[in-house]
């Protein structure tokens, strides 16, 4: 661990460079937040009240804001309108709201601020009713991670501080907030929610529109537009309670009472967002075969890793996401064991199969990481480091710019390596101990490492052999090959190799007859195996000088053979990879198909690399499609794609 001394912060948890607030000076005992929604003006106004303990006896409060109008400030119910200043904007962090605390103010005091959002709010997306599936009512949802809560309300906008919340909102439409419903006042169109578990600002959320609800388990509901409710119920109800029970056995009891999910409109920019009691999900998961429910397992795992135990800043994001991917794969492994036993396999064989499933999912993640690093271009040395440096040279860096699969997959692989070193049984004792130790807290990487070495004193020498500096502070892929079990992937690799070999001899008609027989092997593939098959085909690009655009005949024949399975699939993970393969070969029909597909979704996992590929093979088409669809995207997604296409 000597090699890490130079990186250890002076104090832990490390200070967050992505906030303008003086959050370390206070304990937030309670946050009371009210929203008033105006669909005509497309703004949210409201008031936030902080019950604060001034633990450092400072004479001011600094809060984060971004494109907010501040209309009133008071302390202990006394106006402070002459004692605050909204500083000029400092990109990318916004505008500091500086409030002087009167000398007579007690150590425990209340601060109340009235505010309204503006048209530049980056957290909110207002949708006209025509942009919804039901076409009956407008819709509003928000996405605050990483630093967008400050554009919704004045806040200590950092994961480094948490608070319980009391929420209320006034709107004529069905309204949901990140907590438990306490009361509905239908006469005044006002709802009241509470979140008793302390949460950081990025987990604050609001959604409203034409929303219906149905049960999918004893402690779980799913909510979405009425026209989609039956499909969502079918997709999730088989697995939901099983997911929770397996996670509880792995970690400890679920803290949040209910795990409810909201399937949002297509413009939602992520696969899921782990809002407590209001897990937000992309509609791309609704594919009719339950093959993408792993995203729900991921968001559920966040109930412990991220929501209960939180990274202290976005520099240490891997503590949220690496842990969550690890737990997600353990949950899916355990369910695979149960399924294998139900199919008559013995205990040993079932557990072996479960481990194969986990490692197969890890293979998919490894490929995603490789592809992500390739797409980073000149930024790979900066953004492929596990512990990010967001402090910047002149101004802090935007955490959104650093968002990638690195904290997810590089983080997972570090935890997987630790598990292999100490042994799975011993690591399983560490999991609940770690989450109990840091429950309700925010921590940095060094606190994790210190606790790890303290817990595994007997294995300290072995853990010290990990190349910690390479893992945490050097760019690129993980420094060791994890050598995952390829049993479930081998058939995918073999078929991809046959397709590649066929492409090399595609003018031979006899070869095509044989290829048609071989191609049908995908009929026996699971959805995940189809993903690995397509990933492997894409990966042949530029290997030993090979280029798919020189083998369009093969791509065209594959398009004929695989039309039903791939072009018409409802599985967005498969469809995106299929279009990506064909567009890599510069098949114009599929470049157009990719562009049209990007107009039906808002999930950045597909939108950003999709436009990046189109920009590479046909920039005119990429720009034309983006300009056609950009107003459909959430502000976060729109801003990132504009950067990717260098349109600003």
Curated annotation (Swiss-Prot):
The keyword Acetylation does not apply. Disulfide bonds: none annotated. SUPFAM superfamilies: ARM repeat (SSF48371), Leukotriene A4 hydrolase N-terminal domain (SSF63737), Metalloproteases ('zincins'), catalytic domain (SSF55486). The active site is at residues 299, 408. It is found in: Cytoplasm; Nucleus. Its cofactor is Zn(2+). Binds 1 zinc ion per subunit. GO terms for cellular component: cytosol; nucleus. Belongs to the peptidase M1 family. Its EC number is 3.4.11.-, 3.3.2.10. Zn(2+) binds at residues 298, 302, 321. It catalyses: an epoxide + H2O = an ethanediol. One of its GO terms (molecular function) is metallopeptidase activity. A peptide binds at residues 143-145, 269-274. InterPro entries: Aminopeptidase_N-like_N (IPR045357), Aminopeptidase_N-like_N_sf (IPR042097), ARM-type_fold (IPR016024), LTA4H (IPR012777), LTA4H_cat (IPR049980), M1_LTA-4_hydro/amino_C_sf (IPR038502), M1_LTA4H (IPR034015), Peptidase_M1 (IPR001930). GO terms for biological process: peptide catabolic process; proteolysis. Aminopeptidase that preferentially cleaves di- and tripeptides. Also has low epoxide hydrolase activity (in vitro). Can hydrolyze the epoxide leukotriene LTA(4) but it forms preferentially 5,6-dihydroxy-7,9,11,14-eicosatetraenoic acid rather than the cytokine leukotriene B(4) as the product compared to the homologous mammalian enzyme (in vitro). Its main location: cytoplasm. This is Leucine aminopeptidase 2. SMART domains: Leuk-A4-hydro_C. Keywords: Cytoplasm, Hydrolase, Metal-binding, Metalloprotease, Nucleus, Protease, Zinc.
């Amino acid at each position: 661990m000597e090699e890490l001394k130079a990186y250890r912060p002076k104090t832990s948890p490390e200070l967050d460079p992505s906030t303008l607030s003086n959050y370390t000076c206070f304990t937030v005992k309670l946050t009371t937040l009210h929203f008033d929604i105006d669909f005509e003006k497309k703004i949210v106004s409201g008031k936030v009240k902080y019950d604060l303990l001034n633990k450092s006896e400072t004479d001011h409060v600094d809060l984060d804001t971004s494109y907010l109008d501040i209309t009133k400030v008071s302390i202990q119910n006394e106006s402070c309108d002459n004692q605050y200043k909204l500083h000029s904007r400092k990109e990318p962090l916004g505008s500091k709201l500086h409030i002087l605390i009167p000398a007579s103010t007690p150590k425990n005091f209340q601060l109340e601020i009235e505010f309204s959002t503006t048209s530049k709010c980056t957290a909110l997306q207002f949708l006209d009713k025509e942009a919804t599936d039901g076409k009956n009512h407008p819709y509003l949802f928000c996405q605050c991670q990483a630093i967008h809560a400050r554009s919704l309300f004045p806040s200590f906008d950092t994961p480094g501080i948490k608070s319980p919340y009391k929420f209320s909102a006034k709107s004529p439409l069905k309204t949901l907030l990140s907590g438990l419903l306490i009361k509905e006042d239908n006469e005044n169109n006002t709802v009241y929610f509470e979140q008793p578990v302390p949460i950081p600002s990025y987990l604050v959320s609001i959604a409203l529109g034409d929303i219906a609800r149905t049960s999918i388990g004893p402690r779980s509901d799913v909510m979405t537009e009425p026209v989609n409710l039956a499909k969502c119920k079918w997709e999730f109800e088989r697995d939901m309670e099983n997911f929770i029970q397996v996670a509880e056995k792995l970690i400890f009891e679920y803290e949040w009472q209910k795990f409810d999910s909201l399937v949002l409109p297509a413009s939602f920019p992520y696969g899921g967002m782990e809002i407590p009691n209001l897990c937000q999900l992309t509609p791309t998961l609704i594919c009719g075969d339950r093959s993408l429910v792993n995203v729900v397992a991921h968001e559920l795992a966040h109930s412990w890793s991220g929501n209960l135990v939180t990274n202290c800043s976005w520099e240490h994001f891997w503590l949220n996401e690496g842990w969550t991917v690890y737990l997600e794969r353990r949950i899916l492994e355990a369910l695979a064991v149960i399924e294998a036993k139900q199919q008559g396999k013995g205990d040993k064989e079932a557990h072996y199969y479960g481990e194969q499933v986990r490692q197969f999912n890890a293979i998919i993640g490894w490929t995603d990481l490789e592809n992500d690093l390739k797409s980073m271009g000149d930024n790979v040395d900066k953004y492929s480091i596990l512990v990010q440096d967001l402090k910047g040279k002149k101004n802090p860096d935007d955490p959104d710019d650093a968002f990638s699969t690195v904290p997810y997959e590089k983080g997972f692989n570090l935890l997987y390596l630790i598990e292999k070193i100490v042994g799975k049984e011993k690591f399983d004792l560490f999991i609940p101990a770690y989450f109990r130790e840091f429950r309700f807290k925010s921590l940095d990487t060094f606190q994790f490492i210190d606790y790890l070495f303290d817990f595994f004193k007997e294995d300290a020498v072995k853990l010290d052999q990990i190349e910690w500096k390479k893992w945490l502070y050097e760019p690129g892929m993980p420094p060791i090959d994890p050598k995952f079990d390829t049993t479930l992937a081998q058939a995918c690799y073999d078929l991809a190799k046959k397709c590649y070999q066929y492409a090399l001899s595609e003018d031979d008609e006899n070869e095509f007859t044989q290829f048609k027989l071989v191609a049908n092997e995908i009929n026996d593939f699971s959805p995940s195996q189809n993903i690995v098959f397509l990933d492997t085909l894409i990966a042949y690009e530029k290997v030993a000088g090979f280029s798919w655009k020189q083998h369009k005949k093969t791509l065209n024949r594959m398009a004929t053979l695989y039309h039903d399975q791939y072009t018409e699939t409802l599985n967005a993970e498969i469809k995106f990879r299929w279009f990506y393969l064909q567009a890599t070969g510069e098949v114009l029909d599929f470049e157009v198909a990719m562009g049209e597909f990007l107009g039906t979704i808002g999930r950045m996992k597909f939108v950003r690399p999709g436009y990046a590929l189109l920009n590479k093979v046909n920039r005119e088409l990429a720009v034309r499609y983006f300009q056609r669809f950009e107003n459909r995207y959430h502000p976060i997604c729109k801003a990132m794609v504009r950067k990717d296409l260098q349109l600003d």
